[in-house]
Structure formats: structure tokens, C-alpha cells
UniProtKB/Swiss-Prot annotation:
This is Melanocortin-2 receptor accessory protein 2A. Pfam families: MRAP. Its main location: membrane. It comes from Danio rerio (Zebrafish). One of its GO terms (biological process) is energy reserve metabolic process. Inhibitor of melanocortin receptor 4 (mc4r), a receptor involved in energy homeostasis. Plays a role during larval development in the control of energy homeostasis and body weight regulation by decreasing ligand-sensitivity of mc4r and mc4r-mediated generation of cAMP, leading to stimulate growth during larval development. Acts by stabilizing an inactive conformation of mc4r during embryonic development, when all the energy consumed is obtained from the yolk sac, possibly to speed the rapid maturation to the mobile free-feeding juvenile stage reached at 5 dpf. It is a single-pass membrane protein. GO terms for molecular function: corticotropin hormone receptor binding; signaling receptor regulator activity; type 1 melanocortin receptor binding; type 3 melanocortin receptor binding; type 4 melanocortin receptor binding; type 5 melanocortin receptor binding. Two paralogs of MRAP2 are present in zebrafish: mrap2a, which plays a role during larval development and mrap2b, which constitutes the ortholog of mammalian MRAP2. InterPro entries: MRAP.
Length: 217
């Protein structure tokens, strides 16, 4: 281990400076015997991490139970109420404007509403007929009747439904008073002259011989 010392004295009294340098040359190799990993270090790390994760989730769940998460089911009725109130307000405003202007409700809207009511009634009657047919077939099958009787019941129910639909369509057509024929009296009353939109076209073929006649003269 070499050692080098250097002393230096300045002109200032009672101030002596001394520099010393020391060098250590360790030729021995570094040993890593104490730094070997434990045999079950991976297993220990896994279980420690799992325990930390469980504790963290426990605290998160406790905080959620205290504060409470938002419930989307409670938000949907509120939105529906808002929509219904907005629709009601819109209808009220429309009625007020109609009352101010003095205009009556158009016939087209009334026909649409009647058509929708007719469709709803048809669907309800169809569902009732299907349930009645199912009840009849179930009861008769429990008694032990044959398939022919069940088919007859189905045909009877189907005929009843068709008759009810035909009657309702006839009533609906009578209500709207839609004509299903063409009035030919108006067409017969009109003559050929009335059907013409303008004067007949001028034929230019008659003028051609006259022109040639003038040229010959």
C-alpha cells in the first residue's frame, strides 16, 4: 500500500498545510456468496403481493359501501318522467297555439289515431282468440279427444277472427266513407270539345300545294 505525503508551508505564520494521498490496491476478487437468493423467494413474493392486493380491495369495497355507487335503475325513471313531462308540455303548448289561432285539428291526424286504435284492437283480439283456442285445445286434450276435434276448434276460431276483422274493416271504411268506384256520369257528360285542352294542331300539308301553285304562276 503505497503512501505519499506532501507538506507545504506558506509565508503566513501558524498556518501549515499538509496533503496526504493514500492508494489501496485490493487484488482479492469480490465474492457473491452472501447475495444468493432464497430458495422460496418467488413463492414468498407472490403471497406477499396477494395479501397486499386483498387488503387494498378490502379498503376500496369499504369506501364504496360507505359512499354508495350510482344506481342506473333509479336514473331511468327520472329520465322517463322528464320525457313524459316534456311531451305533455309540448302538447299543451300546441293546444294553446291552436286555440289562439282558431284552427281545428286536421282530419289526417284523426285518421291516423283511429288507424292506430284499430291496429291495437286487432292485436288484442288476436291475442284473446289465440288464448281461447289454446285453452280449448288444452282442456279437450286433457279429456282425451282426437286431433280432428282440435283442428275443427282451430278452424272455428280462425273463421271467427276473420269475420270479426271483415266486420271491423267494413265499419272502418264506412266511417271514412272511401268510395271504391269511379263516377262515370261526369265523364259521359263531358263532350269531345270539352276534353280538348287547346286548339287543334294546324296541318301544314295543305299549305304546301298553295305555295307551289304561286311559284308556277
Amino acid at each position: 500500500m503505497p503512501r505519499f505525503q506532501l507538506s507545504n508551508s506558506t509565508s503566513v505564520p501558524n498556518h501549515n498545510y499538509e496533503w496526504s494521498y493514500e492508494y489501496y490496491d485490493d487484488e482479492e476478487p469480490v465474492s457473491f456468496e452472501g447475495l444468493k437468493a432464497h430458495r422460496y423467494s418467488i413463492v414468498i413474493g407472490f403471497w406477499v403481493g396477494l395479501a397486499v392486493f386483498v387488503i387494498f380491495m378490502f379498503f376500496v369495497l369499504t369506501l364504496l359501501t360507505k359512499t354508495g355507487a350510482p344506481h342506473p335503475e333509479a336514473a331511468e325513471p327520472y329520465e322517463k318522467r322528464m320525457r313524459l313531462t316534456s311531451c305533455a308540455d309540448g302538447l299543451g303548448r300546441q293546444r294553446e297555439t291552436d286555440g289562439r289561432t282558431g284552427l281545428s285539428r286536421p282530419l289526417l291526424e284523426e285518421s291516423r289515431s283511429l288507424f292506430h286504435c284499430y291496429i291495437n284492437e286487432e292485436e288484442r283480439e288476436g291475442g284473446r282468440a289465440a288464448t281461447d283456442a289454446g285453452a280449448l285445445t288444452h282442456g279437450r286434450s286433457g279429456i282425451g279427444n282426437s286431433r280432428g276435434q282440435v283442428e275443427e276448434v282451430g278452424l272455428v276460431v280462425q273463421n271467427m277472427v276473420l269475420e270479426s276483422r271483415a266486420e271491423r274493416e267494413a265499419a272502418l271504411l264506412a266511417h271514412f266513407n272511401i268510395p271504391n268506384f269511379v263516377n262515370s256520369e261526369l265523364n259521359s257528360a263531358l263532350g269531345d270539345e270539352d276534353l280538348l285542352l287547346g286548339d287543334p294542331p294546324i296541318i301544314m300539308e295543305e299549305a304546301r300545294p298553295r305555295c307551289t301553285h304561286h311559284i308556277i304562276d
